[in-house]
Amino acid sequence: MSSLPRGFEPQTPEDLGQRSLAELREMLKRQERLLRNVKFICKLPDKGKKISDAVTKLKAAIAEREEVRGRSELFYPVSLDCKERQKAIAVVDGDRDKAQNSDQILDTSSPVPGCSSVANITSSQTTSRQQGLAHPTRGGDAEAAEAEHTVSEHPTSSSGAPAPSSSQASEGLPQHCALGQVEDHPGSSDNLFIDRLQRITIADPTEHHSEGNRNPENLAGLWSGPQKKPHYMEVLEMRAKNPMPPPHKFKTNVLPSQPRDSSSACQRRGSPISSEERRRRDRKHLDDITAARLLPLHHLPTQLLSIEESLALQRQQKQSYEEIQAKLAAQKLAERLNIKMQSYNPEGESSRKYREVRDEDDDQSSEDEF
């Protein structure tokens, strides 16, 4: 009985759930390698049934993992939007809690109407300003302007003027005490809280400008507004709209397409060029590509001949061809017969050694005759 090599044993379903996708693919590759080994499969008692079952389970697990990963990639932008919205809601909830604490400090007053003081109003106003600087929200500036106007009319003793009495302070703020008493009712606490949250704002002391009251829907727009898409989503959409052309295969002696396209476009836009100019450009293009020049023409270009001239040329070509064939035949025959064609001299070399001798008297007589 032959056992499986180490690392090729079929895995249990519990182990498959804990494996990563790369490990599952590696295991599938090993099991398929075992199945291809026919001799090894024949030696097994179950003839490779366990291995085939393991291959089926691995394929199912890999398909499930890929499907889950595809779904997660599809819903990844949605999860990002949900996370951003949750962050915005958490920020707004924190603003609500801080604003509620500031409203409680602002609305805290004694049951007797004459026990409120300007110092409490000033401290509550400072607290609300600090909270507004940390988390600015949208809203009107009506109640904050009233509190500032009241504090400016009754300056503190540190500026040099006497502080007003508690009765005068309570008379100067009747509306504030009434609002504090109305907020004690539990039924209208939520509505008043939303109203106060909308009214908290920051006013620049150097610039006195009034803003109109905002609608309650603007507060909900803080977390329900359109969220900006991630950068990679914009890149993918842009690439889907404008796909890149496939890279052309490199070929020798071929220039890139861009200069050729530009030159052809210029030729189309320009005036028609003559045949000589086109021939010169083609020759220059050929020289640029191959760095080779055409050989000069040894013959005239083709011409239209008459029938008589063509017959005369054919006869001349036939005669020259026959002469060449006769010379070749004679040369072959001489090679077969071992005949060497040499110059014939019957007298031999000895006749050239002797020179003709003339007498001096004969030379003188010839001169006298002249």
From Swiss-Prot:
Residues 15-69, 303-328 form a coiled coil. Residues 359-370 have a biased composition (Acidic residues). Its main location: nucleus. Residues 228-299, 316-341 are annotated as: Interaction with Pol II. GO terms for biological process: maintenance of ER location; transcription elongation by RNA polymerase II. Residues 101-131, 254-266 have a biased composition (Polar residues). GO terms for molecular function: RNA polymerase II complex binding; transcription elongation factor activity. It is found in: Nucleus. Residues 1-20, 93-172, 204-226, 241-283, 340-370 are annotated as: Disordered. The modification Phosphoserine is found at S271. Dephosphorylated at Ser-271 by the PNUTS-PP1 complex, promoting RNA polymerase II transcription pause-release. Pfam families: GCOM2. GO terms for cellular component: I band; neuronal cell body; nuclear envelope; RNA polymerase II, core complex; transcription preinitiation complex. InterPro entries: GRINL1, Tuftelin_GRINL1A/MYZAP/CCD68. Belongs to the GRINL1 family. Component of the Pol II(G) complex, which contains the RNA polymerase II (Pol II) core complex subunits and POLR2M and appears to be an abundant form of Pol II. Appears to be a stable component of the Pol II(G) complex form of RNA polymerase II (Pol II). Pol II synthesizes mRNA precursors and many functional non-coding RNAs and is the central component of the basal RNA polymerase II transcription machinery. May play a role in Mediator complex-dependent regulation of transcription activation. Acts in vitro as a negative regulator of transcriptional activation; this repression is relieved by the Mediator complex, which restores Pol II(G) activator-dependent transcription to a level equivalent to that of Pol II. This is DNA-directed RNA polymerase II subunit GRINL1A. It comes from Bos taurus. The gene is POLR2M.
